[in-house]
Amino acid sequence: MQIDKVKVAILGSGNIGTDLMYKLLKQPGRMELALVAGIDPASEGLARARQIGIPTATDGIESILADPDIRIVFDATSAKAHVRHARLLRDHGRIAIDLTPAARGPYVVPPVNLGEHLEAHNVNLITCGGQATIPLVYAVSRVTAVRYAEMVSTVASRSAGPGTRQNIDEFTFTTARGLEAIGGAREAKAIIILNPAHPPILMRNTIYVVPEGDFDEETVRQSVAQMVADVQQYVPGYRLKSLPVIEQRSTPWGERPVIIMLLEVEGAGDFLPTYAGNLDIMTAAARRVGELFAAHLLSKLEVTV
């Protein structure tokens, strides 16, 4: 028998979990969505899953643990909840792809280090701001050392649900750590702003990068352009508003050239409105990571009898 699909489940039926459900249905790859689990029987996400014939559960993680065929679990709950979920999933031999800022496993950003942690039991997708800005900081750091990176992420207030609002502190800490650990900056800072404007704005990010020393401007611009193209393979609405700008500025390390990048992320509109690019980039990254984990599992598990 040829095994060609890996069963996966989504834990959390809010905005992120529901958008991820539609992405997995649209581009399943080597994955089969076997269950969507939440805790609110009246949630729109569970109702939509039932309407399209996907099994659902309202007892949270319990139904996932009870099905031994589910190998990969996308956790779209909250950082606090994932602390408990991570332990249970590991104890039951499941792979956790964590869409919360809990950071119980190594950080993963698809175009940067997607293949480095395929034996991990738990990987963390950092934050929406991290998925958006870490690739650009890494694009600089791979061609010249980076002393400092700072990102300011502005998202539509309407795109920030209760889970996002509860995780603000975790967002800033985890994003900054990701800019350092994955982006390659020696030091970093992250800031998020919820903009109540109507109509809602697209996700916008401003990234400041202070290189350690001299660098070739054209090499940096080419590296950034290649990274944008790499991210666009799974987030088509990911785009720079202009070419990177390089300005001489006063910094804590003296007069230095500062690389400034203005980034916009438009969502695909699978479930969430297109202005919610901050959520869309998380679910798109999750699907991308899940796809590689599924392929890796199948490469080890496929048998012919």
Swiss-Prot record:
The catalytic activity of this protein is classed by the Enzyme Commission as: 1.2.1.10
What molecular function terms (GO) are annotated for this protein?
acetaldehyde dehydrogenase (acetylating) activity; NAD binding
What is a biological process (GO) this protein takes part in?
catabolic process
Residues where NAD(+) binds: S13, G14, N15, I16, S159, A160, G161, P162, G163, T164, R165, Q166, N167, N278
Per its UniProt entry, what is the enzyme's top EC class, as one word?
A: oxidoreductase
* Catalytic reaction annotation: acetaldehyde + NAD(+) + CoA = acetyl-CoA + NADH + H(+)
Name the residues annotated as catalytic in the UniProt entry: C128
* UniProtKB keywords: Aromatic hydrocarbons catabolism, NAD, Oxidoreductase
Pfam families linked to this entry? AcetDehyd-dimer (PF09290), Semialdhyde_dh (PF01118)
* NCBIfam families according to UniProt: ac_ald_DH_ac, PRK08300.1
The UniProt family comment states:
Belongs to the acetaldehyde dehydrogenase family.
Name this polypeptide is given: Acetaldehyde dehydrogenase
Q: Source species, please? A: Chloroflexus aurantiacus (strain ATCC 29366 / DSM 635 / J-10-fl)
